[in-house]
Regions:
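A structural signal for multi-pass alpha-helical bundles of membrane permease subunits
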Residues: 2-205
């Protein structure tokens, strides 16, 4: 009897999950099917589910006529440059905070992460004023600067945790062997925190 009750409970749970899945994916499926309908069919019967005619004209229009490919290239280029600069700056800052200013670094990390309490829209007007005065409106450099201002604080906060996980003894051993601070950072510390840098780069991108 108990086993039968478990089966009923399992069936109800699976049925409920199936219904939720259908509700979640139905709008996406409807949008995809609508995108391949002919123009007359889409305007004449917008609530129809299955297309009677098939066309890729809308995709061609978006990709070739509206400059979609160029927009993707611009976005990818800006994102790559932003990520590269943010990771370099954040890695140096996080390492300096952990190794040279540990007490100050704990407070600084909290201050950096609290900047995410405020929604980005609050900075829209100040950013617009600053960029307009600097002549950087509608420029790639302006976008990169804005994105860096959002990505660097969180990247520093993330990397501080990874650099803290590196034992100081490893760095001291490298210095005893004759390595300077730059070499220790580049050849000893960075390889150890490489997974954290990759994770931070993915977030920043």
């Amino acid at each position: 009897m108990k086993h039968k009750g478990q089966k009923i409970q399992s069936f109800i749970c699976h049925f409920y999950l199936i219904i939720l899945t259908i509700i979640a994916i139905f709008p996406l499926v409807w949008i995809i099917l609508s995108s391949i309908k002919g123009k007359g069919e889409l305007t004449g019967n917008p609530t129809g589910f299955l297309p009677k005619t098939f066309t890729l004209e809308y995709f061609r229009h978006v990709i070739f006529d509206l400059g979609f490919i160029n927009n993707i290239k611009n976005s990818a280029g800006i994102a790559l440059v932003t990520t590269l600069i943010a990771i370099i700056v954040a890695a140096l800052a996080a390492y300096g905070i952990v190794r040279f200013f540990p007490k100050f670094g704990s407070v600084m990390s909290k201050v950096l992460v609290t900047t995410y309490i405020f929604p980005p829209i609050l900075l829209a007007i100040p950013y617009s004023i600053v960029m307009a005065k600097a002549g950087l409106v509608n420029t790639r450099i302006g976008l990169i600067i804005v994105y860096l201002s959002f990505s660097i604080p969180y990247a520093v906060w993330l990397l501080v945790g990874f650099f803290k996980s590196v034992p100081i003894g490893i760095e001291e051993a490298a210095r005893i062997d004759g390595a300077n601070k730059i070499k220790v950072f580049g050849t000893v510390v960075l390889p150890l925190v490489a997974p954290g840098i990759v994770a931070t780069a993915i977030y920043t991108f």
